[in-house]
Amino acid sequence: MPHAQCPMPNPMLTTPKHPQEPVLFVIIRLLRWHKPEGRLILMIPALWAVFLAASGKPPLPLVGVIILGTLATSAVGCVVNDLWDRDIDPQVERTRDRPLASRALSVKVGIVVAIVSLLCAAVLAFYLNPLSFWLCVAAVPVILLYPGAKRVFPVPQLVLSIAWGFGVLISWSAVTQNISQPTWLLWGATVLWTLGFDTVYAMSDKEDDRRIGVNSSALFLVIMPL
């Protein structure tokens, strides 16, 4: 697979569609909070875990921490992904209007937003028990490095699925203070669920990814012999 080529972005593709948009609204788009359904990919499995581990009756404060934690974590993932791909996204129809790709926000602002989001997630992690806290720490490098996987790994969506699967491990252990066989079964189901969801999502970028020279599970399934 050839290395990703990153030519100078076409000005016609990087002109913002929202030139008068307030900075706050641009940051909301950077965080993907204008598309809340995407946050559910991480939140739903995490809530599965906390409710199953607590036999349907988890402490409400813990549920709140899990919900806020998934929002903060998904925000980190989205911003870091856009920072990695700021020179690739302008070449993709679906992503060319993202704030960093369209230059509606600077890289410096993107880094600040990523750090603030990560700090918010860290503050919430301190509420958890030691096992859950260290699982949070272990998830960070996977989340930060996932966007680079599409440059070297044929199925980068699997890396994202593993990263989001940490939500199950963290939530379950936050209730039980351990990880048991059912935890791993739920984790495996979550990885497969996320992989399937994100592969369908990647189908719309398949031709752009092939042209640019980046990997995706959508392309992998096309070239994989049956």
Regions found by a protein language model. Give the residues of each.
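Arg/Gly-rich low-complexity intrinsically disordered repeat tracts
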Residues: 1-11
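Transit-peptide-like, low-complexity N-terminal presequences
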Residues: 9-29
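Alpha-helical membrane-protein architecture signal
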Residues: 24, 64, 116, 184, ...
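Membrane interfacial helix-start motif at the N-side
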Residues: 25-38, 104, 150, 216-226
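Intramembrane alpha-helical segments
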Residues: 28-29, 68, 76, 98-181, ...
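Small-residue-rich segments of transmembrane alpha-helices in multi-pass membrane proteins
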Residues: 40-49, 160-173, 220-223
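Membrane-embedded alpha-helical segments that form the functional core of polytopic membrane enzymes
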Residues: 46-84, 94, 118-122, 133-144, ...
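Solvent-exposed interhelical
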Residues: 69-122, 191-226
